[in-house]
Regions:
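Short hydrophobic alpha-helix segments
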Residues: 21, 69-71
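Conserved N-terminal beta-strand and adjoining loop/helix that marks the start
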Residues: 1-17
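Structured-RNA-binding interfaces characteristic of tRNA pseudouridine synthases
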Residues: 114
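Active-site-adjacent beta-strand/loop module that shapes the phosphate/pyrophosphate-binding cleft
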Residues: 13, 71-96, 102-109, 117-133
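Conserved Nudix-box catalytic region and its N-terminal flanking loop in Nudix hydrolases
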Residues: 16-54
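A short coil-to-beta-strand element that immediately follows conserved catalytic motifs
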Residues: 59-69
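Short connector loops at helix/strand junctions that flank enzyme active sites
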Residues: 2, 33, 60, 76-81
Length: 134
């Protein structure tokens, strides 16, 4: 089963989340969390930090990630998606080659599937973050 990760990154004041606009399928043109594939034999948390750095230039010195939850999909292309969350410890200039990066207000409707990828999962993730006061 392929392992993937997505990472919810708050800015230092936790009023914005780092989102990318997908440039390719799946979800081309929609907003999504940053993340990617866990390589075979790779430690899961290390994979999250690696993907975060590759896609945003954020390092482990800038943020402490917490493993929040997992989604497991058993049908079709079975995969496990690990969800991490963290707040930047300082302002960081983000940039990446894979997708356009945008700071979105956390009061956005992340369940809006015309704007956000993941069939409502981004909204669900944020609700779990709020319940757990992360």
């Amino acid at each position: 089963m392929q392992g993937l990760n997505v990472i919810w990154v708050f800015n230092p004041t936790a009023d914005k989340v780092l989102i990318c606009r997908r440039l390719k399928e799946p979800y081309k043109g929609l907003y999504n969390l940053v993340g990617g594939k866990i390589e075979p034999g790779e430690d899961n948390l290390s994979a999250a930090y690696r993907e975060l750095y590759e896609e945003t230039n954020i390092t482990s010195n800038d943020i402490k990630l917490v493993h929040l939850m997992d989604f497991t999909y058993f049908l079709a292309d079975s995969c496990r998606v690990e969800v991490y969350v963290g707040t930047l410890t300082r302002k960081v200039r983000v940039h990446g080659d894979e997708n356009e990066l945008i700071w979105h207000d956390v009061n956005e409707n992340f369940f809006d599937m015309t704007k956000f990828a993941g069939e409502g999962n981004i909204g669900h993730i944020y609700e779990i973050i709020k319940i757990n006061k992360i």
